[in-house]
C-alpha cells in the first residue's frame, strides 16, 4: 500500500499531524521508535506551559494563538480531565530583562491580555512569591498549562478511530526518495508514501545527520508543596529569571507536589544512553534551589524528578522546512525546549503540507537557509 503521508516520530507534533491529516481524509501511517506517549523524548512529565505573549519573539505569537484554538478544541474531547488548564502564567524577572521586554512587546502588538505588576503587587497577589524590589511581573491571564501525555494519547486514539495506520515500537532506519515519493525502511519492512513528515525529535540526526540539531539532557523535578500553591488557590504557572540570567519555569502544585525546571543549561549529549536518569548527575536535585530559595521559599524538599531531552537548533528557534532537494518531505525539528505548546498548530501545518495547501503562517524565520 502507498500512503498519502508517512509520519516519522509520533510524539507531540507527530501525534497531532497524524490526527489532523487523517481527519482531512488522507491515508496516513504514523510511526515511532517507541509506544507514544513514552519517556524517551521531550513530551513526558505530565505538563507543559502555554504562553501567548511570547518572550522568545513576536514571530511565534500567530502560531501560538492558533495553537490555543486547537488546544481548546482538543480539550472538548476530555472535559472530565481537561488537556488545557487556564491557570494564568506569571512571568517574573528584573525590570530590564530582555525576555520580559519581548513578552511586553508581543502583548502590545497583538493586544493580548497581560497585566504588569511591580514587586509589591506581585507579592500582594501571591504571598507565596518573594521577589526583589527591582523585579516586575507580567501576568498572562489567558495562558496556562497543557497535559502533554494526555494530549498525545488523545490525538493517537482519535487518529486511530478515524482510520490512521499506526506502527509503533518500530524504529525507522532510513529514508529514501525517488520519483514515486518517499520510502522508509524499518525492522518491519519498507513503506511508501507520496509525502513524509520528519518530526523525530531529539534523535532526528540518526536519520538525517546533516541537520543542525544538538540533543541536550535536561531535568525537571517535583518539590513538596501544600494547597497554597494549587490552582484551587489561584496560584499560577510561572516563568522566572534570576539576576544572573538563569531561567526557570514551573506549574501550580498538584497532589502536594510542585513541578519546576531550569530552561537554560543542561548537558550536551550525542546518544540516547548518555541521557542518564534523574539524580545521576550531581546537580540534578539542587538545580532549582537558587530559584526556590529566593522566589518560592515556602517550597519543601525534592520528592522526585525526571530527565528529558531538548532538540536544540543553533539559535533555539524552530526548524520548519522541506528537506533540501526533496520538496515532498517536511522537517519539523529543533524545537529547543519550547515547542510542545505549538504541537497542535505544527501538526495542522504538517497536514496542510500533505494536502499541498499553503500555510496561513509566515514560516520564513524557521527555514534551514538561515544557518548557511
From Swiss-Prot:
Keywords: FAD, Flavoprotein, Oxidoreductase. It catalyses: N(alpha)-methyl-L-tryptophan + O2 + H2O = L-tryptophan + formaldehyde + H2O2. FAD binds at residues 4-34. The modification S-8alpha-FAD cysteine is found at residue 308. GO terms for molecular function: flavin adenine dinucleotide binding; N-methyl-L-amino-acid oxidase activity; sarcosine oxidase activity. It is an enzyme of class 1 (oxidoreductase). Pfam families: DAO (PF01266). GO terms for cellular component: cytosol. Its EC number is 1.5.3.-. Its cofactor is FAD. InterPro entries: FAD-dep_OxRdtase (IPR006076), FAD/NAD-bd_sf (IPR036188), Me_Trp_Oxase_MTOX (IPR023493), MTOX (IPR045170). The keyword DNA-binding does not apply. Binds 1 FAD per subunit. The keyword Cell cycle does not apply. Catalyzes the oxidative demethylation of N-methyl-L-tryptophan. Belongs to the MSOX/MTOX family. MTOX subfamily. Monomer. This is N-methyl-L-tryptophan oxidase.
Amino acid at each position: 500500500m502507498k500512503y498519502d503521508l508517512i509520519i516519522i516520530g509520533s510524539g507531540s507534533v507527530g501525534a497531532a499531524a497524524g490526527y489532523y491529516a487523517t481527519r482531512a481524509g488522507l491515508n496516513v501511517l504514523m510511526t515511532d521508535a517507541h509506544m507514544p506517549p513514552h519517556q524517551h523524548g521531550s513530551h513526558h512529565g505530565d505538563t507543559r506551559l502555554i504562553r501567548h505573549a511570547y518572550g522568545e519573539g513576536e514571530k511565534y505569537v500567530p502560531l501560538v494563538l492558533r495553537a490555543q484554538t486547537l488546544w481548546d478544541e482538543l480539550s472538548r474531547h476530555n472535559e472530565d480531565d481537561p488537556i488545557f488548564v487556564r491557570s494564568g502564567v506569571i512571568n517574573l524577572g528584573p525590570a530590564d530583562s530582555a525576555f520580559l521586554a519581548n513578552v511586553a512587546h508581543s502583548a502590545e502588538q497583538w493586544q493580548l491580555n497581560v497585566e504588569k505588576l511591580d514587586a509589591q503587587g506581585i507579592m500582594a497577589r501571591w504571598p507565596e512569591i518573594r521577589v526583589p524590589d527591582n523585579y516586575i511581573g507580567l501576568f498572562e491571564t489567558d495562558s496556562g498549562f497543557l497535559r502533554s501525555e494526555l494530549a498525545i494519547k488523545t490525538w493517537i486514539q482519535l487518529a486511530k478511530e478515524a482510520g490512521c495506520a499506526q506502527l509503533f515500537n518500530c524504529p525507522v532506519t532510513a529514508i529514501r526518495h525517488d520519483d514515486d515519493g518517499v520510502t522508509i525502511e524499518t525492522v518491519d519492512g519498507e513503506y511508501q508514501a507520496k509525502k513524509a513528515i520528519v518530526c523525530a525529535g531529539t534523535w532526528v540526526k540518526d536519520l538525517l545527520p546533516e541537520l543542525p540539531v544538538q540533543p541536550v539532557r535536561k531535568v525537571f523535578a517535583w518539590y513538596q508543596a501544600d494547597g497554597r500553591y494549587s490552582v484551587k488557590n489561584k496560584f499560577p504557572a510561572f516563568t522566572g529569571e534570576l539576576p544572573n540570567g538563569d531561567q526557570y519555569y514551573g506549574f501550580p502544585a498538584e497532589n502536594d507536589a510542585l513541578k519546576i525546571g531550569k530552561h537554560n543549561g543542561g548537558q550536551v549529549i550525542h546518544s540516547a544512553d548518555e541521557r542518564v536518569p534523574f539524580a545521576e548527575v550531581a546537580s540534578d536535585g539542587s538545580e532549582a534551589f537558587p530559584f526556590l530559595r529566593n522566589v518560592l521559599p515556602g517550597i519543601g524538599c525534592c520528592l522526585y524528578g525526571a530527565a528529558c531531552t531538548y532538540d536544540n537548533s543553533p539559535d533555539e528557534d524552530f526548524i520548519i522546512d522541506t528537506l533540501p532537494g526533496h520538496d515532498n518531505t517536511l522537517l519539523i525539528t529543533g524545537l529547543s525546549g519550547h515547542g510542545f505548546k505549538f504541537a497542535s498548530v505544527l501538526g495542522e501545518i504538517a497536514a496542510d503540507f500533505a494536502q499541498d495547501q499553503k500555510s496561513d503562517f509566515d514560516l520564513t524565520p524557521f527555514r534551514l537557509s538561515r544557518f548557511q
